[in-house]
């Protein structure tokens, strides 16, 4: 097991903050945001507004090139809007440094670096991103819980680069969960998982979202998985929000415009499904 668990403190980490109980507004909010890549002739977004509330899972849906991952990068402060403001728990992201942002937002991207760390140490990074910080019993408990929730206990001493793509994806999600931030961003969190693991992982994320009152926002291509696990939806096409809101926002018309093909919502038993239809 890792030697990090026996380290002594040489630097005092910032105390964790939790403003969810003090703020009745959205956890994440974009207000009239515009963004353009350098030297691009056309902006990706103009006047985009968006909200994510505590205890809800929001799916960002759309074809490739719709602007979904760009929106996540803006919400995570990876990129900066050219106009408008983005807030987390009522505070402007633009006023925060990287450390402060990481106290509020955990982000699992599609392109994760794979340091030569054990699974345990990788998840521990969610608690202690600096090796000079001490590790408390609470930290160990949080890490152990995240490992158990993602069924990673058999792999704790394995190196991440020895794992399959799906197993690594679960490690990164566990690390983000261990951060215990009020916002969790996931870019295609199930892309490397088989159908069984997709549902199991999304159920874990769903349970954690509701139990800890986090705001979870994820980009996902599978509309039917989104309909099954998410509360709110943002449907995007070419940088424009076609529709957003609860399940009532996912209409036949909105889906058809978002995916540029005829689609309809069907109810089979208690399950809602998005089905392509003949034109």
Where are these regions (language model features)?
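Helix-to-loop junction immediately C-terminal to a conserved catalytic motif
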Residues: 76
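The feature captures the beta-strand-to-loop junction immediately N-terminal to the Walker
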Residues: 61-63
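Conserved ABC ATPase "signature" region
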Residues: 137-155, 180
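A short, flexible loop at the N-terminus of ABC-type nucleotide-binding domains that lies
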Residues: 17-30, 34-47, 97
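Conserved ABC transporter NBD signature motif
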Residues: 84-92, 101
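Catalytic Walker B motif of ABC-type/P-loop ATPase nucleotide-binding domains
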Residues: 184-188
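Conserved ABC ATPase signature
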Residues: 159-163, 167
């Amino acid at each position: 097991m890792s030697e990090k668990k026996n380290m002594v403190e040489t630097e005092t980490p910032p105390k964790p903050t939790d403003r969810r109980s003090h703020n009745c507004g959205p956890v994440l909010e974009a207000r009239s945001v515009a963004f353009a890549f350098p030297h691009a002739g056309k902006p990706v977004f103009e006047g985009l507004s968006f909200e994510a509330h505590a205890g809800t899972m929001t799916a960002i849906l759309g074809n490739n090139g719709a602007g979904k991952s760009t929106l996540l990068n803006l919400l995570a402060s990876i990129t900066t809007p050219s106009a408008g403001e983005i807030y987390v728990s009522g505070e402007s992201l633009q006023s925060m440094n990287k450390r402060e942002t990481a106290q509020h937002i955990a982000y699992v991207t599609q392109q994760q670096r794979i340091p030569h760390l054990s699974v345990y140490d990788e998840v521990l990074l969610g608690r202690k991103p600096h090796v000079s910080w001490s590790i408390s019993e609470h930290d160990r408990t949080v890490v152990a819980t995240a490992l158990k929730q993602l069924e990673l206990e058999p792999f704790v001493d394995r190196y991440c680069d020895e794992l399959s793509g799906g197993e690594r994806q679960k490690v990164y999600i566990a690390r983000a969960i261990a951060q215990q931030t009020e916002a969790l961003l996931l870019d295609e969190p199930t892309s490397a998982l088989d159908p069984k693991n997709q549902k199991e992982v999304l159920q874990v994320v769903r349970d954690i979202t509701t139990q800890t009152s986090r705001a979870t926002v994820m980009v996902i291509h599978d509309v039917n998985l989104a309909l099954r696990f998410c509360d709110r939806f943002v449907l995007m096409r070419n940088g424009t929000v076609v529709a957003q809101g609860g399940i009532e926002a996912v209409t036949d018309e909105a889906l058809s415009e978002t995916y540029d093909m005829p689609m309809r919502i069907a109810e089979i038993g208690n399950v809602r499904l998005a089905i392509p239809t003949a034109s």
